[in-house]
Amino acid sequence: MSTAITRQIVLDTETTGMNQIGAHYEGHKIIEIGAVEVVNRRLTGNNFHVYLKPDRLVDPEAFGVHGIADEFLLDKPTFAEVADEFMDYIRGAELVIHNAAFDIGFMDYEFSLLKRDIPKTNTFCKVTDSLAVARKMFPGKRNSLDALCARYEIDNSKRTLHGALLDAQILAEVYLAMTGGQTSMAFAMEGETQQQQGEATIQRIVRQASKLRVVFATDEEIAAHEARLDLVQKKGGSCLWRA
């Protein structure tokens, strides 16, 4: 029987906004960090939560997502003031983050601004993208945090606005459910029904236009496209290309 201790930190951030072109983090700042500690698949209550003064204004679009106002952040510490405590908290742990590229990009950017030669986060933490895990488990389905809550019947009624600590707490429950065993029979049957319906629809299209060559996107192309849409939707609040 293994006695190894597994320490995971489920983490989320809120920011002043994001760039649609180029590096999504450049010129923007983290304004909230929420992290939940999980040891051997148990929530410990040893959480990390802080609001940060960004020394720049919050974009209106980002404010619409998380509701964190410029005035509220005026008396909060800067990232530089909490960086050491934050690094000590996450060092050596497995970070579980939904759409990890977004948050890790911001974290590495903030560390680089300190001019202290701090290495990339993935050199002192293992990084697990829970969105990538969900996509492997449920290909072709919506795998946003809200969609996963509905799938696993996890209460997210308090999530009227995005908040880093609340989102981290919800994600911790979701991730434990995702990695804890098989899903319910009802959900499995629902998935099979949807798959059968999808296959039937494809067959009808082929019969009606048998001479038309249909070129489908590869799995890699679909994954890359969905990743970009998730990045836009996660911190933009909405995505034009999704209903």
Swiss-Prot record:
One of its GO terms (molecular function) is DNA-directed DNA polymerase activity. The active site is at 162 (proton acceptor). Its cofactor is Mg(2+); Mn(2+). It catalyses: DNA(n) + a 2'-deoxyribonucleoside 5'-triphosphate = DNA(n+1) + diphosphate. One of its GO terms (cellular component) is DNA polymerase III complex. InterPro entries: DnaQ, DnaQ_proteo, Exonuclease_RNaseT/DNA_pol3, RNaseH-like_sf, RNaseH_sf. In a ternary complex this subunit contacts both the beta sliding clamp (dnaN) and the polymerase subunit (dnaE). The DNA polymerase III holoenzyme complex contains at least 10 different subunits organized into 3 functionally essential subassemblies: the Pol III core, the beta sliding clamp processivity factor and the clamp-loading complex. The Pol III core (subunits alpha, epsilon and theta) contains the polymerase and the 3'-5' exonuclease proofreading activities. The polymerase is tethered to the template via the dimeric beta sliding clamp processivity factor. Pfam families: RNase_T. This is DNA polymerase III subunit epsilon. It comes from Escherichia coli (strain K12).
